[in-house]
């Protein structure tokens, strides 16, 4: 029989680090657990944060260089202040503890004072008592009591990049999914970058058959590589249930990888068939004159969309931030079809008229996610898989 798991404490070059080791089988051949756990700071510290948060908070980060201010914003929205303590948890399916020092310290010399240097969050100076990373690489790990106990106690959760197919395969239908949705119901701040962003919408591009380029998606909206959430689509088919992103599918690395075409295709796939228009298997209406309409959000690299509720659970606003040294505008795009696609079927190029796009390219404007207003929109059309004008 395997011996009990033990928690070992050690101090090393990056500061106080807790590492959970599962004891070896008596043969010494295998670890008892597949997950990996890393922490900096004191994860056992007692915190003094109210568990009655008033407003939901989310971060959609577009990949590439992480946006320092987005992490600071999450920490503040969690109710963390100097002296309160606070537990910031990173979730991922692959990788290691790379986020721990970045979020906790204010610089490469492990300083814990303000102001933080560029490229560092300064979480300890803001009040965090720990940053913990859990690598959850399979369904057994996602059901593990220790993994879920760490996440349950989190004051903020951030889902790293990687491959969203791993998150869907390993976490959906597990205790970890339930734990995350419980945190969302408690209004604990949750964010994600790249693949982590991809699972925050009600609908997910699951990438179960790999990724797809815009040109391929527009040419065949039913390409086998387009795997969206569950099959068939269902309002409960996504991994997470964040009310801010109802009827929404998200995408990252947006301008850099030219993903407008595939996001328009993903959104079109959500639109239900009716009177000869729409997409087979879709379950949502097109937006004009309808509630709960199909929509999409595309976030550029080195940008983050900060989303906040008003406390009612019904109204959400968003603001885009980026690092001061980021080149270019790093915009966020909000996409919705005003009409159902007139051609959306297997092996046929997509045709959809009156796709409305709104571009948020500054950090001062507030976008209203509840009624899709705040910046002016423009209209593009897709005819036989081709845009009639630049969608950017």
Predicted regions and their residues:
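Extracytoplasmic/secreted cell-surface and envelope-processing proteins
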Residues: 67-70, 96-104, 141-144, 165-176, ...
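C-terminal and late-domain segments of enzyme folds
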Residues: 31-84, 95, 99-100, 111, ...
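ATP/NTP phosphate-donor binding region
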Residues: 69-78, 84-149
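Flexible gly/pro-rich beta->alpha loop and the following alpha-helix that scaffold active-site loops
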Residues: 141-188
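Bacterial N-terminal signal peptides that target proteins for export
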Residues: 1-13
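Sec/Tat signal peptide C-region and signal peptidase I cleavage site
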Residues: 25-29
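Bacterial N-terminal signal peptides
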Residues: 13-23
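Catalytic nucleophile loop
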Residues: 160-161, 184-204
């Amino acid at each position: 029989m395997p011996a009990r798991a033990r928690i070992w404490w050690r101090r090393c070059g990056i500061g106080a680090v807790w590492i959970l080791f599962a004891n070896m089988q008596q043969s010494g051949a295998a670890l008892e657990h597949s997950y990996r756990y890393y922490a900096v700071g004191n994860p056992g510290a007692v915190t003094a944060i109210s568990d009655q948060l008033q407003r939901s908070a989310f971060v959609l980060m577009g990949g590439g260089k992480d946006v320092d201010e987005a992490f600071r914003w999450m920490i503040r929205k969690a109710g963390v202040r100097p002296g309160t303590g606070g537990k910031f948890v990173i979730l991922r399916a692959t990788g290691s503890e790379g986020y721990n020092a970045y979020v906790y310290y204010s610089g490469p010399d492990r300083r814990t004072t303000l102001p933080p240097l560029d490229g560092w969050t300064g979480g300890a100076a803001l009040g965090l008592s720990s940053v913990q990373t859990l690598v959850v690489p399979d369904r057994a790990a996602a059901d593990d009591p220790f993994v879920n106990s760490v996440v349950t106690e989190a004051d903020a959760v951030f889902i790293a990049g990687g491959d969203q197919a791993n998150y869907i395969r390993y976490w959906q239908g597990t205790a970890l999914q339930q734990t995350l949705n419980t945190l969302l119901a408690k209004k604990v701040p949750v964010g994600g970058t790249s693949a982590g962003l991809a699972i925050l919408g009600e609908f997910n591009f699951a990438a179960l058959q790999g990724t797809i380029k815009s040109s391929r998606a527009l040419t065949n909206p039913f390409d086998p590589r387009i795997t969206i959430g569950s099959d068939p689509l269902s309002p409960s088919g996504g991994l997470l249930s964040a009310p801010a992103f109802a009827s929404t599918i998200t995408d990252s690395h947006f301008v850099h990888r030219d993903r407008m075409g595939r996001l328009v295709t993903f959104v079109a796939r959500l639109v239900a068939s009716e009177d000869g228009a729409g997409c087979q298997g879709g379950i949502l209406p097109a937006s004009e004159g309808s509630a709960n309409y199909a929509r999409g959000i595309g976030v550029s690299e080195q940008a983050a969309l900060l989303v906040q509720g008003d406390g009612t659970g019904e109204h959400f606003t968003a603001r885009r931030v980026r690092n001061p040294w980021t080149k270019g505008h790093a915009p966020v795009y909000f996409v919705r079809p005003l009409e159902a696609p007139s051609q959306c079927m297997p092996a046929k190029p997509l045709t959809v008229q009156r796709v409305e796009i709104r571009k948020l390219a500054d950090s001062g404007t507030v976008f209203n996610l509840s009624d899709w207003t705040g910046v002016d929109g423009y209209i593009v059309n897709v005819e036989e898989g081709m845009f009639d004008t630049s969608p950017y």
